[in-house]
């Protein structure tokens, strides 16, 4: 006899119940980015996942990026992107567009998607409620010929120096789901564009989040045979960076995970945001679908 759809849903919910109980009243920060942001169907699936987390008693917080959309808007407005050491230089005109795209357009699109599920999302950035303060990022690059380090001036690219959790604690006690753009003020009065991964890590650390999820375009951390590594300690992650197993763009991602754990996050997961309902599959199944990094 074939299992009906309702019977299948009931069986899946029964399996998920222990995990729902485990995460009840816990904070889960989700960094939303990558391919999933540009796919309408994946966007709807993501919004429904966040809504179900809230309905299950979890306190979800969304932090989002938007690099491709920023680049597209700069091109549309005829502003040429400048790069130093492979990093985008953000001048005054550029940071104004960054804030417009991140805190305006993208943020409100995500808020609208979640609101369409029947839940209440609220769009924020680091400026709201003095939630986050930043300072000018200090980046260096080493000259391959002379081996001398050179300081890069990236303009209004910032690093988080302070997180005030007051507003987020208030929202956690409400029915609201915060959706946060990685833009923050400095004590100098300037506006700074902040890497969304490090911004999410700082938020999660300040809240001592149970989980921080990074939605990416890859399955997670892979071993030398290309197989997914399900769990890593911080020490094991350092060792895999040292021996070259973790390489390229995955290195800064894993280093951000490690920083978040040092800041107080209980566990950080790198997972594939291109998988529909990836958030639920990670949180409400026994083994998850990504790589969990723990202390």
Swiss-Prot record:
User: Enzyme class, one word?
Assistant: transferase
Tell me a GO cellular component. cytoplasm
Q: Which UniProt keywords apply?
A: Amino-acid biosynthesis, Arginine biosynthesis, ATP-binding, Cytoplasm, Kinase, Nucleotide-binding, Transferase
Question: Could you tell me what this protein is called?
Answer: Acetylglutamate kinase
> Mind telling me which InterPro entries this protein's record contains?
AceGlu_kinase-like_sf (IPR036393), AcgluKinase_fam (IPR004662), ArgB (IPR037528), Asp/Glu/Uridylate_kinase (IPR001048), Glu/AcGlu_kinase (IPR001057), NAGK-C (IPR041727)
Which residues are listed for substrate binding in this entry?
66-67, 88, 193
Q: Where in the cell is it found?
A: Cytoplasm
Its pathway, per UniProt, is: Amino-acid biosynthesis; L-arginine biosynthesis; N(2)-acetyl-L-ornithine from L-glutamate: step 2/4
What does the sequence similarity comment in the record state about its family? Answer: Belongs to the acetylglutamate kinase family. ArgB subfamily.
The record, for CDD domains, names: AAK_NAGK-C
Q: Which residues constitute the signal peptide according to the record?
A: none
EC?
2.7.2.8
**Site (described: Transition state stabilizer):** 31, 253
- Which superkingdom, per the lineage? Bacteria
Q: What is its main location?
A: cytoplasm
Task of the protein: Catalyzes the ATP-dependent phosphorylation of N-acetyl-L-glutamate.
């Amino acid at each position: 006899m074939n299992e009906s759809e309702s019977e299948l849903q009931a069986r899946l919910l029964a399996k998920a119940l222990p995990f729902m109980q485990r995460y009840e009243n816990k904070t889960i920060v989700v960094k939303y980015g990558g391919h999933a942001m540009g796919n309408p169907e994946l966007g709807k699936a993501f919004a429904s996942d966040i809504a179900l987390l809230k309905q299950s008693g979890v306190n979800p917080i969304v932090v989002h990026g938007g690099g491709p959309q920023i680049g597209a808007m700069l091109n549309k407005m005829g502003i040429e992107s400048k790069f130093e050491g492979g990093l985008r230089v953000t001048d005054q005109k550029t940071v104004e567009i960054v804030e417009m795209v991140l805190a305006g357009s993208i943020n409100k699109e995500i808020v609208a998607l979640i609101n369409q599920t029947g839940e209440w999302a609220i769009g924020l950035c680091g400026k709201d409620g003095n939630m986050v303060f930043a300072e000018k990022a200090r980046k260096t690059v080493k000259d391959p010929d002379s081996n001398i380090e050179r300081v890069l001036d990236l303009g209004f690219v910032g690093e988080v120096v302070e997180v005030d959790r007051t507003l987020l604690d208030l929202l956690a006690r409400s029915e609201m789901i915060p959706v946060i753009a990685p833009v923050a003020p400095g004590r100098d009065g300037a506006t700074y564009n902040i890497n969304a991964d490090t911004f999410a890590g700082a938020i999660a650390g300040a809240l001592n989040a149970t989980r921080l999820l990074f939605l990416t375009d890859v399955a997670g951390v892979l071993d030398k045979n290309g197989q997914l590594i399900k769990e890593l300690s911080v020490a094991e992650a350092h060792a895999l960076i040292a021996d070259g197993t973790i390489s390229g763009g995955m290195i800064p991602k894993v280093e951000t995970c490690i920083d978040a754990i040092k800041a107080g996050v209980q566990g950080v997961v790198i997972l594939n945001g291109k998988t529909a309902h990836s958030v639920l599959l990670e949180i409400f199944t026994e083994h998850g679908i990504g790589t969990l990094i723990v202390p």
